[in-house]
């Protein structure tokens, strides 16, 4: 079938329903079909079970293409294809549908220009100079606003509109919630869990209790209808999704989509398989569908038309919806060449688009490990900006995610110093790290820091707060808070790209009705998954600590260097004799930082430890209570005593006293206006600023969400595919 791909290079052969005011051209790739017809169902979205009003025979073209052109303004007309294969007629929703009806069972012709909100053509992305300037906040549409204390208007709760509504506070207070909280916190980017049309929510029964993360895709090029104000009208979800992106951009926040191209929610009766049986999915040695996703199937990205489908879809979202980045679910199931092509095509649109993903699979796959986009193969991207999640730093901070009671550096484990150091240098090559002692590997896997996503928690597994409590059931809340603060301090002072789970900043917890912690809440009720905004008040100290760390990172380039060479030259670990103690210095003079020398110390022991710093006289800006860019204390001499379970960041007194803000970073200093998310800095090493295509650092961060996702995803996704 690969020969069919050649014809599709022709611009004329644009798959899907191609609308114009006076006609619409329908094009489907179905090379094994003996007959294809176009079924038209009228323009009533509420009449979603009616029989076809008109059925038209399509013409067979070259190389598997079927097409028909129908005159008239068909905007809003629902349609499907009737595909005959081996004498059986399959009703197929267009794999390239740009709009659908309720539950995604019928495609809809759409005039996309009519879905643009006012001012869409002038939508401006918040500036991003370097990928490492990103601060990513992972959230779920429903979780973010469904809580009774979110302050969001009732009809907007759990919807696209609830994400961007401004002026919201916890009722009866001035404590900010929603998008205003994000602006106050200082994040640059929201990563939104799957928002293209998925199977698990019945959009005709939204008055019943339903919940799902959405990792069971049905229609790749259409927003999910359950988050819209009207899932029956195909145009509404599109317009409201665009409004969400536009308003987030106005708030200085970029948008990353969590995309699930590695599998589909259905297999035998998926749109793809009904159109071209067995082509879109890999098979195992027994001839059945392979299951590297843990969800019943896995797409074959190495096949030309599957690769085309994925690349076309990503490009479509980037262009039509102004998306700023893509996080690839189970990226390890995609082949390296597909990921490279995605990066190349996105660079043609906007080099600042991030790409990152999970550098693992959810089970065994027939795709060769040499060709797979797994974490270990990140080096094969050269200097492309395709990033993977660092399970190294995640598990080094808090313990293995698949062993709930296993601790690590911050919560009582021993022997994780080198793993933390490996995370600090963004999993890049560094002679100061003893790779034989790194928990999850023995060598560097990233060529550049912008290829690494650092995090302590994500939607999978226990929340950070719940993990810390589980590993230390007898610890006081004050002790757990210190562990949480150190976890955050490690993430936000490490090189690479920082990432956090929504609510982590105020001790997010997921508690089941029986009082146990939920480690796989993919379909748990709102009571488990919602962002509990009252915790922002209860844990205001922790929230302010995160806010201060973000301010520190955004204000000082030393914490977000652009290249491995910069890290090797300007980050020096301090030799310490004590266990559970990591210390290092940063030379800011070579990376455009107003602070000449910075020292960072993590003392995970239950007692104070003394560290001798190079040079004398230091100013403390981060301690066990506060974080930021303001003076907390002054240290005379070179010896500093770090309290138990405490992180310290110190600055040499002379450069601190100069009172200058990081060169080129003035606009980064957090403020109440939307400019607090403008990222500026040293551009000298930003591939997007050079003409050298070989060193391009594609900013479509393929967030390889690291973590041994095999277990998590097998569990999560088997549950999704019944």
Label each PLM-derived region with a short phrase:
Residues 110, 343-344, 352-507, 513, ...:
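Conserved alpha/beta catalytic core and glycan-binding cleft of carbohydrate-active enzymes
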Residues 30, 75-76, 633-662:
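C-terminal beta-strand-rich structural cap/linker in extracellular carbohydrate-active enzymes
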């Amino acid at each position: 079938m690969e020969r069919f791909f050649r014809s599709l290079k022709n611009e004329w052969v644009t798959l899907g329903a191609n609308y114009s005011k006076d006609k619409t051209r329908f094009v489907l790739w179905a090379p094994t079909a003996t007959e294809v017809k176009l079924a038209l169902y009228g323009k009533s979205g509420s009449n979603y079970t009616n029989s076809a009003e008109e059925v038209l025979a399509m013409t067979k073209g070259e190389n598997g293409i079927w097409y028909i052109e129908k005159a008239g303004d068909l905007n809003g007309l629902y349609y499907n294809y009737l595909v005959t294969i081996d004498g059986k007629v399959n009703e197929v929703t267009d794999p390239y549908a740009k709009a659908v009806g309720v539950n995604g069972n019928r495609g809809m012709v759409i005039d996309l220009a009519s879905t643009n909100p006012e001012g869409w053509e002038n939508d401006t992305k918040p500036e991003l100079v370097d990928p490492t300037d990103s601060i990513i906040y992972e959230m779920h549409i429903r979780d973010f606003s469904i809580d009774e204390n979110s302050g969001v208007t009732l009809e907007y709760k759990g919807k696209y509109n609830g994400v961007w509504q401004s002026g919201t506070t916890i009722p009866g207070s001035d404590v900010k919630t929603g998008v205003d909280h994000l602006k106050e916190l200082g994040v640059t980017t929201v990563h939104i869990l799957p928002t293209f049309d998925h199977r698990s929510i019945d959009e005709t029964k939204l008055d019943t209790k339903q919940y799902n993360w959405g990792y069971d895709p049905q229609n790749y090029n259409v927003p999910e209808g359950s988050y819209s104000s009207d899932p029956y009208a195909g145009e509404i979800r599109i317009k409201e999704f665009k409004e969400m992106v536009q308003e987030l951009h106005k708030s200085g926040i970029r948008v990353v989509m969590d995309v699930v191209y590695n599998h589909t929610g259905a297999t035998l009766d998926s749109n793809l398989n009904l159109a071209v049986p067995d082509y879109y999915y890999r098979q195992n040695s027994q001839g059945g569908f392979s299951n590297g996703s843990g969800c019943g199937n896995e797409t074959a990205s190495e096949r030309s038309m599957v690769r085309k489908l994925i690349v076309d879809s990503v490009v479509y979202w980037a262009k039509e919806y102004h998306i700023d980045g893509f996080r690839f679910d189970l990226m390890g199931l995609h082949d390296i060449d597909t990921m490279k092509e995605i990066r190349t095509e996105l660079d043609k649109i906007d080099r600042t688009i991030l790409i990152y993903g999970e550098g693992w699979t959810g089970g065994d796959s027939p795709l060769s490990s040499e060709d797979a986009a797994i974490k270990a193969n990140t080096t094969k991207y050269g200097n492309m900006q395709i990033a993977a999640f660092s399970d190294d730093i995640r598990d080094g901070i808090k313990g293995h995610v698949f062993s709930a009671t296993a601790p690590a550096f911050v919560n009582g484990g021993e022997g994780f110093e080198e793993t933390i150091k490996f995370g600090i240098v963004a999993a890049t090559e560094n002679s100061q790290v003893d790779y034989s002692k790194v928990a999850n590997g023995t060598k560097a896997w990233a060529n550049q820091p912008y290829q690494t996503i650092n995090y302590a928690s994500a939607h999978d597994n226990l929340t950070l707060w719940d993990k810390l409590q589980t590993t230390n059931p007898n610890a006081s809340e004050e002790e757990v808070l210190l562990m949480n603060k150190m976890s955050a301090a490690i993430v936000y002072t490490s090189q690479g790209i920082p990432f956090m789970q929504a609510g982590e900043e105020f001790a997010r917890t997921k508690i089941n009705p029986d009082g146990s912690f939920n480690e796989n809440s993919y379909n748990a009720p709102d009571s488990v998954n919602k962002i509990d905004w009252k915790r922002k008040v209860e844990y205001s100290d922790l929230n302010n600590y995160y806010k201060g760390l973000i301010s520190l990172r955004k204000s000082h380039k030393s914490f977000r260097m652009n290249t491995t060479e910069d890290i090797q030259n300007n980050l020096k670990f301090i030799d310490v004799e004590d266990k559970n103690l990591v210390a290092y210095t940063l030379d800011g003079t070579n990376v455009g930082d107003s602070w000449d020398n910075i020292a960072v110390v993590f003392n995970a022991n239950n007692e104070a430890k003394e560290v001798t710093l190079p040079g004398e006289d230091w100013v403390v800006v981060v301690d066990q209570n506060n974080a930021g860019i303001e003076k907390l204390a002054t240290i005379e001499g070179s010896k500093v005593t770090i309290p138990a379970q405490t992180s310290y960041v110190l600055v040499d007194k002379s450069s601190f006293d100069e009172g200058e803000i990081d060169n080129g970073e003035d606009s980064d200093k957090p403020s109440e206006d939307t400019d607090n998310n403008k990222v500026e800095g040293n551009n000298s090493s930003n591939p997007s600023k050079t003409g050298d295509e070989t060193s391009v650092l594609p900013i479509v961060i393929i967030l390889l969400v690291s973590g041994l996702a095999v277990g998590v995803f097998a569990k999560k996704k088997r549950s999704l595919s019944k």
